[in-house]
């Protein structure tokens, strides 16, 4: 085990860590009340699911889509069945007739049309989802039948409609001026929990929906409690003030690996990990014209500086496997190998020399035309593992004569930089099993995705067109081949450097049963969990 933090070491010395002292009462009270209280580094935010200001794990307790994406494919949810026209452009959904919104309003075809129309009024915001650009119109056929018409066939349509947002449903009574793009009055969905008291930057309550149309939650309440990651979150779990923690929708864990082990060792908690959900990666911004990262040869050199085996083993403690390609082979349509560059400092050095960046006699930093080889890297300051990786890469880059300045920022600020292009390198992650490969690939050319990162590619328009064409292919083998061709070109550009295949980690009371995962790293089925 790596060196303990000072606070944890003090607790261990005082005998509090392993005895479980002080934690049982809080845990027992929560069990008696059938309540989970999870620790989170940020407030749940704006719970309007038609924009992107809220916590996805929180929103998924309240709102539901027409269909759900499972390991066995697309399954019914609010729609009990559907038909697809021969040309692949018309989807007819037959809705459940026993669903009510939290405010008592009937869920029907009219509500579906109003919600999808509301999302489409803000479709530029959703451009990373291809379906948002293809929806032509929505027609109500009868009270519980709705028709969705696309401008062209789009094979991933159902998968994108199954996502936790934005195509989920808010009570039309909550709309402002007949739409949701400027906010909603309340947050009434159809899901197994209702939003209760919300104290901004403190806590939020999600109460059991006793009128839920499906299997009702065994828990009476799920509470989100805001606190800093690290020691504060650890002590809160130890005392039983909170009793649940999980990887959030930005890939951030409130607890580091040492804290996870210590909590498990108390005997009060269990730790569960999902299958690989996404790929953690380093994004190198080809569009940053005032920096060396705009040079393809330099980007390729950086790809050879990342020792993913060492990162996975030593920094991630073996909990995540090294990622040798952008998408793992458990992702839909990725049934091929696409190995990326291997760790090779000699090769990296050769490529930097080739790009004209030379080591001088009086400086450890490479120079070209009198300019130092310097880059800025950004990581999520809420993630202890990203910080460790950034520090490790800083040392590796120094060996190669690169001055790497590392900067920790909030996850929201990182997302802003991704959109604006104001970065040289940053840590990020693929969209995940529920979304991929289509969503991450679509994001290669989306303004609020990775357009800035790919904007420096010489033949970018050709690649962008290939992406659009791939999404129209109905045949699975042909679509897979198209994705392979796109990913081969992208990998050659050295923009997305895979590091590890990330999974979702959950810390839960030892006597909590049915702790499971979905296909999404952005949500958890809290309604299925129950105490022994």
From Swiss-Prot:
PROSITE patterns: PROKAR_LIPOPROTEIN, SBP_BACTERIAL_5
BP-aspect Gene Ontology terms: cobalt ion transport; copper ion transport; iron ion transport; nickel cation transport; peptide transport; zinc ion transport
Lipidation (S-diacylglycerol cysteine): 21
Residues engaged in binding staphylopine: 165, 418, 448
Xref: InterPro entries: CntA-like, Peptide/Ni-bd, SBP_5, SBP_5_CS, SBP_5_dom
UniProt keyword rRNA processing, yes or no: no
NCBIfam families: nickel_nikA, opine_bind_CntA
Protein task: Part of the ABC transporter complex CntABCDF (Opp1) involved in the uptake of metal in complex with the metallophore staphylopine (StP). May be involved in the import of a large array of divalent metals ions such as nickel, cobalt, zinc, copper and iron. Binds the metal via the metallophore StP, and transfers the StP-metal complex to the membrane-bound permease.
Family: Belongs to the bacterial solute-binding protein 5 family.
Record-given protein name: Metal-staphylopine-binding protein CntA
Source organism of this protein record: Staphylococcus aureus (strain Mu50 / ATCC 700699)
């Amino acid at each position: 085990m790596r060196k303990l933090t000072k606070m944890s070491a003090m607790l261990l010395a005082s005998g509090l860590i392993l005895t479980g002292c002080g934690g049982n009462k809080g845990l027992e009270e929560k069990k008696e009340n059938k309540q989970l209280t999870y620790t989170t580094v940020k407030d749940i935010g704006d719970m309007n699911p038609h924009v992107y200001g809220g916590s996805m794990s929180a929103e998924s307790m309240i709102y539901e889509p027409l269909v759900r994406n499972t390991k066995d494919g697309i399954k019914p949810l609010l729609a009990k069945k559907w038909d697809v026209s021969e040309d692949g452009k018309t989807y007819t959904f037959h809705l459940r007739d026993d669903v009510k919104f939290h405010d008592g309003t009937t869920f029907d075809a009219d509500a579906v049309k109003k919600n999808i129309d509301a999302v489409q009024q803000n479709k530029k915001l959703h451009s990373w989802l291809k379906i948002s650009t293809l929806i032509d119109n929505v027609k109500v056929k009868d009270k519980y039948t709705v028709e969705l018409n696309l401008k062209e066939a789009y094979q991933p349509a159902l998968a994108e409609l199954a996502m936790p947002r934005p195509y989920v449903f808010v009570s039309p009574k909550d709309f402002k001026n007949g739409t949701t793009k400027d906010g909603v009055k309340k947050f009434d969905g159809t899901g197994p929990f209702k939003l209760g008291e919300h104290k901004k930057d403190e806590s939020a309550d999600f109460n059991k929906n006793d009128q839920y149309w499906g299997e009702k939650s065994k828990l009476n309440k799920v509470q989100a409690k805001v606190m800093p990651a690290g020691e504060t979150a650890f002590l809160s779990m130890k005392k039983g003030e909170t009793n649940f923690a999980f990887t959030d929708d930005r890939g951030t864990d409130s607890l580091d690996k040492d804290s996870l082990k210590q909590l498990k060792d108390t005997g009060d908690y269990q730790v569960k990990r999902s299958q690989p959900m996404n790929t953690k990666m380093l994004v190198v911004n080809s569009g940053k014209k005032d920096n060396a990262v705009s040079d393809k040869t330099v980007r390729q050199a950086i790809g050879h500086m990342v020792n993913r085996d060492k990162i996975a083993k030593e920094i991630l403690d073996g909990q995540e496997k090294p990622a040798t390609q952008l998408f793992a082979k458990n992702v839909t349509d990725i049934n091929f190998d696409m190995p990326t560059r291997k760790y090779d400092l000699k090769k990296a050095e050769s490529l930097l020399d080739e790009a004209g960046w030379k080591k001088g006699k009086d400086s450890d930093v490479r120079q070209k035309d009198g300019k130092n080889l310097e880059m800025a890297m950004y990581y999520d300051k809420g993630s202890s593992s990203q910080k460790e990786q950034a520090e490790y890469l800083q040392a590796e880059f120094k060996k190669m004569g690169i001055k790497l300045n590392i900067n920790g920022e909030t996850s929201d600020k990182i997302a802003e930089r991704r959109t604006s292009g104001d970065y040289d390198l940053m840590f990020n992650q693929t969209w995940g099993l529920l979304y991929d490969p289509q969503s991450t690939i679509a994001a290669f050319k989306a303004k609020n995705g990775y357009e800035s990162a790919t904007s420096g590619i010489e033949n970018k328009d050709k690649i962008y067109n290939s992406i659009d064409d791939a999404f129209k292919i109905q045949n699975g083998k042909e679509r897979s081949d198209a994705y392979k061709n796109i990913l081969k070109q992208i990998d050659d550009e050295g923009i997305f450097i895979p590091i590890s295949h990330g999974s979702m980690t959950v810390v839960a009371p030892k006597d909590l049963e049915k702790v499971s995962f979905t296909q999404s790293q952005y949500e958890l089925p809290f309604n299925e969990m129950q105490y022994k």
